[in-house]
Structure formats: C-alpha cells, structure tokens
Regions:
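Conserved glycine-rich beta-strand-loop-beta hairpin in the small C-terminal domain of fold type I
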Residues: 145-153
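Conserved PLP-enzyme active-site core in the AAT-like
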Residues: 1-120, 124, 130-133, 139-140
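Short glycine/threonine-rich loop-to-helix capping motif typified by GTGT followed
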Residues: 114, 152-155
Length: 155
C-alpha cells in the first residue's frame, strides 16, 4: 500500500516502490508486484508501473475522480495482469467489455479532467494543515514542506 492510510508511518514514494520492485524481481522473477495506489495518483511525477510495479489499482472517488466521481476504481499495469483482474472484478465472461454502468461516464471523465487541479489544491491544503497544527504543538506527518507521496496528512 503506497499510502500510509491510518498507520502512523511515512507513505511510500514511487522511488521507494521502484527499489522494492527491483529487489523483489531480482530475488523472485515470477513474483507479481502489486501496489494499492489510493491517495497517491498524480502526487509525484511518475506512477508505480513506471518504476517496476506489475499492477496497480486505485479508487476513482479519490484523486483520479477529481472529487466528483461517485463510484469506480481502476487497474493498470501489465496487460496480461490487467486482463486477469478484469475477468475477476466483473461477472464471469464479461471481463473488460462491460464498461461503466449507472450513467457514470460523464462524471468519470469530468473527474479525470479535474483531477490534476484537485490533487494540487489538496496538497497545498495538507501542507497548510501540517504547518498550522505543528505550530500548535501537535505531531504531524508528513511535516510542512516535506516531499509528499500521497494526499494523507496525519495530525
């Protein structure tokens, strides 16, 4: 899991994920490196597949949904693994051919369009929260001004 979630630990940077994937693939070439990418999309210049992750998945109601997508998720990475995931995440025999339902296409596309701006604004807000609460004496993670790998700000 890239994001710290509810744990008091630093989130994993894409660079760290790359080092882990490289080591895992060196020691176990057939091992599949899967990354839960929730809260991490668009925060750094690269995403985990660019540095060796075989498969990533995340939610479309968070970063990539631009805060307006009401439902959905995604998988990305090696095409054979994406196809296998699609066949397991939908009804048998449908695979990736099913597409979205509930007339969500417009909201999903608008969310993808808004996502870079929403993520950038969220990072600015999280940094402000870190600074204000640290000044008030609270422990925060990450600290204000720190490089971030996801949107999570713990206080």
């Amino acid at each position: 899991q890239r994001s710290c979630g509810y744990s008091w630990r630093p989130s994993l940077s894409v660079q760290t994920i790359g080092r882990l994937c490289e080591r895992i693939h060196r020691l176990q070439p057939d091992c599949i490196c899967f990354v839960d990418n929730c809260y991490g999309e668009l925060v750094e210049e690269q995403e985990p597949p660019a540095v060796g992750a075989d498969l990533v998945a995340g939610s479309l109601i968070k970063n990539l949904g631009g805060t307006i997508a009401p439902a959905g998720g995604y998988v990305a990475g090696r095409s054979d693994l994406v196809e296998q995931a699609c066949c397991r995440l939908t009804a048998p025999g449908i695979g990736r051919e099913g597409g979205t339902g509930f007339d969500l296409q417009r909201l999903l596309l608008q969310g993808l369009f808004l996502a870079p701006q929403m993520v950038a604004e969220s990072l600015i807000g999280a940094d402000l929260v870190a600074g204000v609460f640290a000044d008030l004496g609270f422990r925060v993670q990450p600290a204000a001004g720190a490089l971030r790998s996801d949107l999570i700000q713990a206080v």
